[in-house]
Amino acid sequence: MPMTLGYWDVRGLALPIRMLLEYTDTSYEEKKYTMGDAPNYDQSKWLSEKFTLGLDFPNLPYLIDGTHKLTQSNAILRYLARKHGLCGETEEERIRVDILENQLMDNRFQLVNVCYSPDFEKLKPEYLKGLPEKLQLYSQFLGSLPWFAGDKITFADFLVYDVLDQNRIFVPGCLDAFPNLKDFHVRFEGLPKISAYMKSSRFIRVPVFLKKATWTGI
């Protein structure tokens, strides 16, 4: 039986999960929920099902795999990664994955907070000012490695790709000063399963955020 991934019909938090499902050749189907237009941004399509799915902490995204029902995007990623040995093989690799997972969420939500804020135009310059320093840290962390944990890909690379790519959409050219990050971005998109997915009708690059965001990526 295929897994079911539930999320809004946007990129949001789901792209790393979608890409990991594709990369691992996992049989899955998507349940995409649509949010209504302004001014009410109706969420009834999700809310009508929210408490009927048997989820311990009902939220989007969710993943249903038989009797296993998960919410929280990183918990879902780790669940899938454990099935395929993509959590790091050595203690050093697992430490790097753990650090990245949490650091990326910090940086992800810094962008989210700017883009959903009614004070977007006031907050954007400060975000742009601090972005090069954040990217420099990722560049130093990667160094000359092909993947962020080491020689082999892990689920953390799916998170890094997503955060870097969202920032590329927000600030075109922001990776130009960091050749190893640009190379990583190209390397990731060049993975055969990822490349095929990105060419398919299932792939959602934008909108990055929901309609109620000030900046959605479109």
From Swiss-Prot:
Q: Name one GO biological process term.
A: glutathione metabolic process
Which residue ranges does the record assign to the GST C-terminal domain?
90-208
The enzyme's main class, written as a single word, is transferase
**Where glutathione is bound, by residue?**
7-8, 46-50, 59-60, 72-73
**At which positions is substrate bound?**
116
Annotated keywords: Cytoplasm, Transferase
Q: Which domain of life is it from?
A: Eukaryota
Name the reaction it catalyses: RX + glutathione = an S-substituted glutathione + a halide anion + H(+)
Main location (coarse class)? cytoplasm
Compartment(s) of residence: Cytoplasm
Identify its protein family. Belongs to the GST superfamily. Mu family.
* PANTHER family in the record: GLUTATHIONE S-TRANSFERASE, GLUTATHIONE S-TRANSFERASE MU 1
This protein is called Glutathione S-transferase Mu 1
- Organism name: Oryctolagus cuniculus (Rabbit)
